[in-house]
Amino acid sequence: MKSLVPLVVFAVHLASCSLDPLAKALGLNSPFLDDRAEQTHDYVQWLFPLDEPSGSVQGAPVLSDLDIDEIKKSPAAQAYLIKASEWFFQFLNRNQRWVAKYDHKQLRITRAIRSLRLLVGDIEADNFRQSIFDYLGEDVDLIGEKAKSFWKGA
């Protein structure tokens, strides 16, 4: 697998910024962030990298074992990932079209949970997943069983 040590440097830089990580990465102010995120289909692969290729975005980052170790050891990278998960959760709250039987954002939620588990830990991943279920409340039945199963297994 290719190494993404530059991604670690990128994450450390973003963690030190006061703006949302995606807004800073795209050079945007927060009011324009949601529209830009909707148009940028690979943003979640950069916000929440994994150690395996993306099934939907060719050329998306793939973390090596070295990258994973460096991210786990970096307080700034950890802070970046937590900040990214907070932004993503708020993005989902503001853009509720994903609350349906199927929506591509449900795959992004799975990726976020998996990335948090891989790079930050079980507690942060479980908290993010639980925040999604808490947000859905009674509307959880609108989400397809397959998506809910992926979230629980991520």
Language-model features: where?
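Alpha-helical bundle/repeat cores within regulatory domains of eukaryotic proteins
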Residues: 96-154
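N-terminal leader regions that mediate targeting or early regulatory function
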Residues: 4-96, 113-116, 123-126, 131, ...
